[in-house]
């Protein structure tokens, strides 16, 4: 579970055949009945059929699961891969999962299933190397030093300028002999400082609140700019008792960060491009909501 704030836009009827634009009023308060009703989603008929037929075997590990295998991050046998939407993201997503987080209860796997080319999941203490990249990587996590998404570009620019000043202070090294710093993806510090701020990667923590500080305070993440989603509220069915409704599940945090980034940083009108990140989440939300509404006992083992 990620710990950042957010509300949920909403999903359209008739399997969301038409994309409904999310209006500001829909993203700043929770709809009382269905906060996910206006999302622009692919057909969920494949999930309805899978839910009716019951658990199926994972094609890779053979485990019995509902909808997807949370261990292998793949759909199970009765959910054809070609019927699962694939979402293209503008940023790379790294999810740091606490080793004690229960895989079957985490929504982090939703992101990997739906945006496999952009999402990586690491189990703590395994954390990617971010040293020297704090001007293009942010951590989504609430705290006293956290900023809003609207201020991300400003603070990244300040970090770039700081690096530029440090470079200029190195008077003993001729500019042509300064070391060019690159990584396997072609990352180049000197090129990026010339081009201005560009966010490339976002880090999320997948953990219960009581376990998050161990990861957030890790020295490998300590220097990253912290971003908080302050206007969003969760509708997660496993919301932690006693915690504010601005603490989101992991998939909610990823989704709302991208929606806000699209509008506030890229300055483009949001038209549902990332709504399918909630493809599994919205379906499971309704299953549990309907079960509770009809007096049935909601099944916590839905995907376990």
From Swiss-Prot:
Coiled coil: none annotated. InterPro entries: DTW, tRNA_Mod/Golgi_Maint. Signal peptide: none annotated. It catalyses: a uridine in tRNA + S-adenosyl-L-methionine = a 3-[(3S)-3-amino-3-carboxypropyl]uridine in tRNA + S-methyl-5'-thioadenosine + H(+). The keyword Cell inner membrane does not apply. Keywords: Nucleus, S-adenosyl-L-methionine, Transferase, tRNA processing. Residues 180-193 have a biased composition (Basic and acidic residues). GO terms for molecular function: tRNA-uridine aminocarboxypropyltransferase activity. It comes from the Eukaryota. GO terms for cellular component: nucleus. It is found in: Nucleus. The keyword S-adenosyl-L-methionine applies. It is an enzyme of class 2 (transferase). Its EC number is 2.5.1.25. Residues 1-29, 165-193 are annotated as: Disordered. GO terms for biological process: tRNA modification. A motif (DXTW) lies at residues 206-209. Belongs to the TDD superfamily. DTWD1 family. Catalyzes the formation of 3-(3-amino-3-carboxypropyl)uridine (acp3U) at position 20 in the D-loop of several cytoplasmic tRNAs (acp3U(20)). This is tRNA-uridine aminocarboxypropyltransferase 1. It comes from Mus musculus. The gene is Dtwd1.
